Amino acid sequence: MCGLVFMGSKNIGYRDVEVFEEMLFCDTLRGSHSTGVCGIFEDKEHGTRNKLVKAAVPGPEFIASGFLDEAISIRTKNGNVTTIKRPIAAFGHNRYATKGEVNAVNAHPFTHDHITLAHNGTLTGQHRLIDHKKFEVDSENIAYSISKVGFVETLKNLDGAFTLIWHDSNLNTVNTIRNKERPFYLVRTSTNDWFGASEKEMLLWIMGRQKSPITIAEQFECEPGVQYVFDVTNGVFSFKEKVKHELPTFTRFPYSSSYSNFYGDDDYDYWTVS
């Protein structure tokens, strides 16, 4: 079990950063083996660029060590004045390792060419993805596949549980999609700030405990098979569209099962027909 957190806004301020930090901290309950954050910044030459920081430490240590601040700030110094530039969007991942060793290399997110991606879930049929033997971690294989053959072709071969968040620097978009085996919730505020997390109760609790009140305009669980697309062209964050996809189906024969837990998203073992 892993966890994902997300924020995006036309003007990310202190309160947004505080909410994101607290989400990343609490999301450690879903995975304490490693933590990673991708900050997406305006770039005058390319529209956007991202800054990726990850480490094999739990969320609280990631924050205390300054890794989070490194991922979501660009500092420039002019004499005695230091200017801090904030991202227009960011997503974070708290990993509980199911495939691959616990180290910074295997921490999420993963970058391949123009795709930077984080994944909650486990693929039972990684062999369906291109060049699968090259990758110890199935999640990195997903990022690689999207960078090579695109998201639509990759989706056809996603055999297993997933929620994905990824930044496409070619299209200048941030995207999320899930299947029914993994959760993800989004909240839009009255000022059109967006937040997301794997756990609804955690997300709403953190937003509700802020000193400066946050008014929620809408909240919802992402619909399975729907790609939520956020535009970050020219460094301006906005919701763009929802794209409905047909999720692939595979024949599976369960031969053992994990215990059920409160979250209802354990990993299971299957014989999968190729």
Model-derived features: where do they sit?
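Conserved short alpha-helical segments that host acidic/polar catalytic motifs at enzyme active sites
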Residues: 1-274
